[in-house]
């Protein structure tokens, strides 16, 4: 679609897509110009200035896209990169001697999206505005939460567990599908979501099914389905 080449980073379990020919670069810039919502737009617009000056183009410089997140697939792409679909399955544990509950049983679905606080020291390089917009997308009226991975890494986090709020996400991702392997996790996560909505997660069969689904999600996944890539034909 855009050309370029792939570089495999085996140690990091990652693939890097590199676009470096002039034609491919200009094509990519033209397609995504006006669609950016994060502080990365600063470097992107610097690239446009360089292209315009170097090659006498007249590529327009746009500000951050502030349209509704429901209006396009940008959030879907952001989730593909950094979102997480989680299933919590905690079995009830009881002391056989005292009959005291040691651990309460709990089953829930959760969505989490984390992003570093900023990409520089300038206030315009903060991720807070876009993360707050995503936070508001789910109907939250409170301020953003922070998540610390260690002493020097602090992130903004949007975390959702309410079934009603998660339904907003499901509707959105049905309209703007995920395109990476994360689509597989989303579909399995939706199965657990529906079991909870239907109160089937409380039955022995439901618990067993959820346990099996969870065992093949995210980093534990061994079975992949790529049928969803058909959506690329609509791009």
Predicted features and spans:
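Internal intein/HINT superfamily modules and their associated LAGLIDADG
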Residues: 1-235
